[in-house]
C-alpha cells in the first residue's frame, strides 16, 4: 500500500507503507551501518529527486502514520513521550535557499543537499541540484551512485569555493532544533545540522522502536489469537499495537470471568 501527503513546501510525496516485517529488516540494517540503515529508510520514499530536508519531513510523517505519533525521550523522570508534531512544529518550514551560479558556461543550481552525510565527503557536491551546459540539463538527485561520481569528477575546481560560500551564507538554514530545552523534565535541547552525520543518525534513532526479540515475542503472543502470520507481519506496527491491546484487554476479561 502507498500513502501520499503534502509537505510544508506544498510538494506532494508518495511513500510505501512501512510494515511490521520491515521493522525486523530495519533492525538488521540499524545494527550494521548508518549507510545501510538510512538507505533502507529512503527506499520507502517513492517520490524522486527530493533533497534531504524533504526526505526528513517525509520520513517523520511516515513514522507517525505507520509506527506512532510519539517517541520516547530520556529525562530525569524517565522516558517521556514526545509528539512528532511537536518536533515538526519546532522545525517549522525550511526557507527556499536555491541559488543559481555560472562557472565556465556551466549553470549550477545550489540547494539543500540530496544526499545525507554518512561519512562520504562527496555528499557535499549534492548541494548542486542541477547542472546545465548548452542545452543539456542534469538533475543530480536522479543520478545513480556511479553517474554521480562521474559527473562531480568533471566539475571545474572552482566549484569548491562556490560551495563553501553557499554553506557559510546559509549556515542558519542548515541548523534545526528538534527539541527545545525543558528544565522541569531535564530534557536537553537537541539541535541538528543537516550537513552533519548526526542528522541521518537522528532519523534512524526515531525508527528504532522494536528489537528482534520483541518482534518475535509480539508475533508469538498474537499468533494465539490471529493464526494468519502473514496478516500480522503485513500490518503496520501501529496496527500491531492495537491488536496487542485488544488481545490483552480480552485476556484480562476472560481471567476475571
Predicted feature locations:
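An amphipathic, hydrophobic-aromatic interaction surface with interspersed Lys/Arg
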Residues: 1-257
